């Protein structure tokens, strides 16, 4: 029989899954609708589409692992699931890095010649360099994940050598994350500096258009800060999620760590929706119509 704590964790996991499913689904539909409306892809729409798609896959992988991990413990399918999981996780981080670079290019205002040159000429080159590094890191992750050797199972009380997979999983998860994290932090730092210099200018000049630019700075920083916090929680919870599945598994620990991991692809989608005015207004209208319909048809 399930305990009250385990039942609560299951409820939270279901709520997170539904929030992420709806949020990422809205972002995917919005990106495709913008493409149909304009018959062209913008950089921002492509980044949002890729980010939402990766989060959508990551959510289903978490649910799949949470539901079927007892069946995968003694199966080679766990190795392939683990590799695919790492690839999707790294792709999500890279799309978030592209988003931070996009914000930095569109919002920051510096008058220094070096920055103007970087903004005008080196932006596209930097994206191609990041894409090349991303492909290399994916290939290395696949090679490490698919060539790892499993020791014989024998009569061990642990059906699957999780102590070995723990270190392998952490290595796989972090091997391709160092460069995008550095770029992400540099871009976020430039946004903070730009907001600070803009705030100083506002003290001298009148408000007006500069208020909109300050609001854009704050919205971008909220989205990037939320992503960084949730991603760090996801990274910390990942190895503990693996070790909690040793045989016999501790279901309470499994749900605690998996719920923390599921917050990453679910909650950040809400921050992205709040940062897109048209999507935010559409969601508010839908919620308002739903509430009104419930009041009209309710008892």
From Swiss-Prot:
The chain crosses the membrane at residues 2-22, 46-66, 83-103, 128-148, 176-196, 224-244, 254-274. Keywords: G-protein coupled receptor, Glycoprotein, Membrane, Receptor, Sensory transduction, Taste, Transducer, Transmembrane, Transmembrane helix. The keyword Transferase does not apply. InterPro entries: TAS2R (IPR007960). GO terms for molecular function: bitter taste receptor activity; G protein-coupled receptor activity. Receptor that may play a role in the perception of bitterness and is gustducin-linked. May play a role in sensing the chemical composition of the gastrointestinal content. The activity of this receptor may stimulate alpha gustducin, mediate PLC-beta-2 activation and lead to the gating of TRPM5. PANTHER family: TASTE RECEPTOR TYPE 2, TASTE RECEPTOR TYPE 2 MEMBER 5. This is Taste receptor type 2 member 5. It comes from Papio hamadryas.
